[in-house]
UniProtKB/Swiss-Prot annotation:
<feature type="modified residue" description="Phosphoserine">
    <location>
        <position position="466"/>
    </location>
</feature>
<feature type="region of interest" description="Disordered">
    <location>
        <begin position="691"/>
        <end position="891"/>
    </location>
</feature>
<feature type="modified residue" description="Phosphothreonine">
    <location>
        <position position="782"/>
    </location>
</feature>
<feature type="region of interest" description="Disordered">
    <location>
        <begin position="410"/>
        <end position="440"/>
    </location>
</feature>
<dbReference type="GO" id="GO:0045742">
    <property type="term" value="P:positive regulation of epidermal growth factor receptor signaling pathway"/>
</dbReference>
<feature type="compositionally biased region" description="Basic and acidic residues">
    <location>
        <begin position="694"/>
        <end position="703"/>
    </location>
</feature>
<dbReference type="GO" id="GO:0016020">
    <property type="term" value="C:membrane"/>
</dbReference>
<feature type="compositionally biased region" description="Basic and acidic residues">
    <location>
        <begin position="873"/>
        <end position="883"/>
    </location>
</feature>
<dbReference type="Pfam" id="PF07894">
    <property type="entry name" value="SACK1"/>
</dbReference>
<feature type="region of interest" description="Disordered">
    <location>
        <begin position="554"/>
        <end position="621"/>
    </location>
</feature>
<feature type="compositionally biased region" description="Basic and acidic residues">
    <location>
        <begin position="746"/>
        <end position="762"/>
    </location>
</feature>
<feature type="modified residue" description="Phosphoserine">
    <location>
        <position position="422"/>
    </location>
</feature>
<feature type="compositionally biased region" description="Low complexity">
    <location>
        <begin position="731"/>
        <end position="742"/>
    </location>
</feature>
<comment type="similarity">
    <text>Belongs to the FAM83 family.</text>
</comment>
<dbReference type="InterPro" id="IPR012461">
    <property type="entry name" value="SACK1"/>
</dbReference>
<comment type="function">
    <text>Probable proto-oncogene that functions in the epidermal growth factor receptor/EGFR signaling pathway. Activates both the EGFR itself and downstream RAS/MAPK and PI3K/AKT/TOR signaling cascades.</text>
</comment>
<dbReference type="GO" id="GO:0036313">
    <property type="term" value="F:phosphatidylinositol 3-kinase catalytic subunit binding"/>
</dbReference>
Length: 1012
């Protein structure tokens, strides 16, 4: 308009097709100024003088004279009585307001431009023509169908029916914005008062007034126009626009027409409403209360400051559940509040009592129907997840926040947090939040100790579950909050990691580590160990077999399971303790005297891989020096759950052995073991990777002895031992325990071997006797018959351990001792490489089992042939009887064994086992007592196996070297070590039966042949 009425309109060459000749007339402006300044008579005189017609209607003249606002006379001119002749009426020169535009504090849906599609317009007339519904009924229907927002722009609003629909929509959580013409607002206010409703008390309704443009005269007097727009905007998707005003007369008397608009054109109405709302103002009737709230310069919900206005307090108290709704859907606008730092995320106090355990006290709900609201968890964080207009609880409005702010006058705005237990007015009125303001920072353990334990009904209540709310994760945390009952299950992993990190940072490399007694703090007796071991039975089965350990790659063992966890791996130079003290659960206090052991029975390094030890001490400077200097001290370095103290055996240990039978993890009695270890604080999980013993001591009784295969095959020439120690001390620790894979490899090359488990009967005493007789017949064979029997077919003994499953056949080392013998004397480097390669996965170990035996094992068999004498027949019978005692065989196992014929068919025929020397009386008593024992298929879940091993088992391995080695592999029940050293360098691929073999091992125990 300005461009058309100025110089641009004088140039004919710039005219376009849209050019319209300007209609501006200067005498119009002068006539209006005369009317404003001097009245109606002066106006008419001016028109006569200028010889122009009257251009103002009588209604307009009356409106101007009624609404004109003149400035005071004393300020009309300056002090020098000069007038600003350059001033203008101002209608052509828009002024920018210095007042901040009001916010759509209830929120406003965001509509992506261009996504509403093409515009569609329907025309409605009043009275109705082709439509069934009238304009008023259509308006009511649109308000009922609203889900997010209802925006009304109206000149006059006095229709009671439409007003009731709006109030009811606000109680459903729909945001309602009403813009009324300022000059007609008094009519609307009168209507609401007649209906008994205080509109300013409604929490989800915002009512503001809009006036038209200001007309400024030359002298400074002004008047403003009216807002004559009339449209209804619902959810920013549908608009009703027309001449229909919300009055009774428009329904009954006036003719009107409206348009129902959807599509792209709605975006323009959206923009227009927000423009009108920005220029709107608080009605004069509400100005007093609004001025009190806005006095600090910021909105109440921005700074949390409340001025304690009596009227505002009444407003807050009177609005509680005035139109309470049952379904709580709506939430505050997250972008608005998060941008102002009002409700920061509760990351710092997410473990506090009020977030998880705290429940609000019951407060009677006097003004509304929703009493269950006080007992429901908060949906506060839904505000950050869901759209701000998916629904809102009607309490969360600035009117509600008025009273809530009274409790936070001393708090900074940024720290103001709503409690996550309840958002109701009642919870805020009781002042419960004030006690939560200055709580000092606490650790999680302290908060957990102070946490109010919720009952089962509160934890599992499904009264109301939102799809996106926080009550889901709160319920999840409550149901899984660690308690005294499930602390073992819930904190094992975290404590294990903490213990590992603490050991890595505080313990020197050669430290003994925490004692196993410390790790078992709280387990006072074997019964307690057995009871607590039930939690971790499932971890036993897979951890021993599938997780090999090397000194180069140490693993952390579970204190309760004894299993090895390969996920925590230390390097060779790490601070993790390298050895586990040779103390057991049943072991009495250790003495200062070393065990007297003849030096002639000490093992060479070449024979040490045959030791079926669960753990092997590796402290090279100490354990090996004991071997060279004082051979009698060696057995202290060997773990007591595998070695045999034949000097100090008592029949008292038999009960404990039977009690702890069929469990393959080491148990320790902390009350009886207190070695020098500095990191006892890591008693729950300390690295059980071969803790080193500074001073081996002689135990009075060694109780936890595994079945016959848990013996020390550690006797050979003293010269070889010294030679190996001098040449390759680092590899000694790597070769002290033989892997299950090595045993499989040893027996893999005998293709004619078949299992005899299918011949065995069910688990009964007669069956055990039958199996014992067959063993006696096999053991009593002469070496010549043994050779002939090995050529045809020999039974393979399946051995079972609760931790893992392994099929091992008998005596395969003896078939090829000479082939690998030349490799032994000159292969310390090969031994080191093979042991270093043993940290590979079990898959590689099983692939390597198929082709050839380990040269180290074969060479050991050859060397032992030169040393050990042959046993006597009596010794064979006794050792066989003792071996049967620890040989459970079940019908279920037989079925599984038949399924594994493919594996066993690849095994070589077994050598005849060689019996062990004569047992002592107490050992014989143990053998007989355990021989009568009937095994149950459920024993792995009830007991910890510690089968009795006679003291002569140590001697067994020294008497007849050529046969003992094979019998050790083939007939002895052995405990698989959780830290097995796989000699993968000597193995080759073994892939066909890998999946079946793995499943077989996980179902049953560890099959290692027992030694007689």
């Amino acid at each position: 308009m300005e461009a058309s009425s100025m110089l641009s309109s004088l140039n004919d060459e710039c005219r376009s097709d849209n050019y319209v000749e300007p209609h501006y007339k200067e005498w119009y402006r002068v006539a209006v100024d005369t009317l404003i300044e001097h009245g109606l008579e002066a106006y008419q005189e001016f028109l006569i003088k200028e010889r122009v017609s009257d251009f103002l209607a009588e209604e307009e003249i009356n409106y101007i004279l009624k609404n004109v606002q003149k400035i005071a006379q004393n300020t009309e001119h300056g002090s020098d009585s000069s007038c600003d002749d350059g001033s203008s009426s101002g209608t052509y020169w828009p002024m920018q307001s210095d007042v901040e535009a009001p916010n759509l504090d209830l929120g406003w849906p965001y509509v992506m431009p261009g996504l509403l599609g093409s515009t569609h317009i329907d025309l409605l007339f009043h009275p109705p023509r082709a439509h069934l519904l009238t304009i008023k009924e259509t308006i009511r229907k649109m308000i009922k169908e609203a889900r997010k927002v209802v925006a009304i722009v109206m000149d006059v609003f006095t229709d009671v029916d439409i007003f009731k629909e709006i109030v009811e929509a606000s109680t459903r959580g729909i945001s309602v914005y009403i813009l009324l013409d300022e000059s007609n607002f008094s009519h609307f206010l009168t209507m609401t008062e007649k209906q008994g409703c205080q509109i300013q008390r409604l929490r989800n309704i915002r009512i503001r007034t809009v006036k038209g443009q200001d007309y400024l005269s030359k002298t400074g007097a002004k008047f403003h126009g009216k807002m004559e727009q009339k449209f209804l905007l619902v959810d920013c998707q549908k608009v009703m626009y027309g001449s229909y005003s919300y009055m009774w007369s428009f329904e009954k008397a006036h003719l009107s027409m409206v348009q129902i608009i959807t599509g792209h054109l709605v975006e323009l109405f959206d923009e227009e409403f927000r423009t009108l709302y920005a220029r709107s103002s608080v009605p004069s009737s509400f100005a007093q209360e609004e001025s009190v709230r806005a006095k600090p310069g910021k909105a109440l919900w921005e700074n949390g400051i409340y001025q304690r206005s009596i009227s505002s307090l009444a407003s807050v108290s009177s609005q509680r559940n005035l139109f309470g709704r049952q379904d709580q859907i709506h939430k505050l606008d997250s972008s608005y509040f998060k941008g102002r730092g009002i409700y920061p995320l509760n990351d710092q106090d997410k473990h506090s009592m009020r977030n998880h355990g705290y429940k609000p006290h019951f407060v009677p709900n006097f003004n509304g129907p929703s009493t269950i609201r006080h007992f429901q968890p908060s949906q506060l964080n839904e505000n950050w997840k869901r759209h701000s207009y998916a629904g809102e609880q009607p309490e969360t409005t600035p009117y509600l926040l008025l009273n809530r702010a009274m409790n936070r006058t001393n708090n900074a705005p940024g720290r103001w947090r709503r409690p996550s237990d309840s958002l109701s007015v009642a919870s805020s009125l009781r002042g419960g939040q004030g006690s939560q303001q200055n709580i000092p920072a606490q650790s999680f353990a302290d908060r957990l100790a102070q946490r109010k334990t919720t009952n089962l009904a509160e934890r599992n209540s499904n009264v109301r579950r939102s799809f996106n709310g926080t009550d889901n994760h709160i319920r999840f945390i409550q149901q899984r909050m660690p308690t005294l009952e499930n602390t073992t299950k819930s904190f094992l992993r975290s404590w294990r990691i903490e213990s590992y990190l603490n050991d890595n940072s505080e313990v020197p490399p050669d430290s003994n580590g925490s004692t196993l007694g410390d790790r078992f703090e709280g387990y006072e007796n074997p019964e307690a160990v057995k009871a607590n071991a039930l939690y971790t039975h499932s971890r036993l089965r897979s951890s021993f077999v599938f997780k090999p350990t090397l000194p180069e790659q140490k693993e952390v063992n579970s204190c309760t399971t004894g299993s090895s966890n390969s996920t925590i791996i230390g390097s060779q130079g790490s601070d993790t303790p390298n050895e586990v003290p040779d103390t057991s659960t049943n072991a009495p206090p250790l003495t200062e005297k070393p065990l007297p052991e003849p030096s002639s029975k000490l093992p060479t390094q070449q024979e040490e891989p045959k030791m079926h030890n669960l753990q092997v001490p590796e402290k090279q400077p100490e354990a090996l020096n004991q071997r060279t200097n004082g051979r009698a001290e060696l057995n202290n370095c060997i773990y007591t759950n595998l070695c045999v103290n034949k000097q100090r055996e008592n029949t008292e240990n038999q009960q404990n052995d039977n009690l702890l039978k069929r469990r393959s993890f080491p148990s320790f009695d902390h009350s009886k073991v207190n070695l020098e270890h500095g990191n006892s604080k890591n008693y729950v999980y300390s690295t059980l990777t071969r803790n080193r013993i500074r001073q081996p001591e002689k135990p009075k009784e060694v109780v936890l002895k595994s079945s016959k295969s848990m013996h020390n095959v550690t006797h050979s020439a003293e010269e070889d031992d010294d030679e190996v120690i001098e040449r390759d001390p680092p590899s000694a620790s790597a070769t002290k325990s033989i892997s299950i894979a090595a045993l499989l490899d040893v027996n893999k090359e005998e293709p004619n071997k078949e299992p005899n488990s299918k011949k065995e009967g069910k688990a009964s005493p007669s069956f055990l006797k039958k199996g014992s007789q067959k063993l006696r017949s096999l053991l009593s064979l002469t070496p010549e018959k043994r050779e002939s029997l090995a050529k045809n077919k020999a039974p393979a003994f399946y051995r079972m351990c609760s931790s893992s499953d392994t099929l091992v056949s008998e005596g395969e080392e003896n078939q090829k001792p000479k082939k690998s013998e030349p490799k032994v004397d000159s292969s310390p480097r090969r031994k080191r490489s093979s042991s270093s390669n043993s940290q590979g996965s079990i898959h590689k170990s099983k692939e390597d089992i198929a082709v050839s035996a380990s040269p180290g094992i074969s060479s050991q068999a050859e060397e032992s042939r030169r040393i050990a004498p042959s046993p006597r027949p009596v010794e064979r019978r006794l050792s066989e009887r003792a071996g049967d005692a620890s040989a459970p065989r079940f019908n279920t196992e037989q079925i599984q064994y038949r399924d594994s014929k493919e594996i066993s068919s690849l095994m070589t025929p077994a050598r005849r086992p060689t019996p062990s020397p004569v047992l002592k009386p107490n050992e014989l008593l143990r053998s007989h007592s355990t021989n009568q024992r009937v095994y149950s298929r459920f024993e792995p879940f009830c007991k910890i196996e510690s089968s009795i091993q006679p003291a002569s088992s140590v001697t067994n391995t020294h008497v007849n070297r050529p046969e003992v080695k094979s019998s050790t592999m083939g007939t002895a029940y052995g405990r698989s070590s959780p830290m097995l050293n796989y000699k993968t360098g000597a193995y080759h691929s073994y892939a066909p039966n890998e999946n079946k073999f793995r499943g077989f091992m996980q179902k049953f125990g560890n099959f290692i042949h027992k030694n007689k």
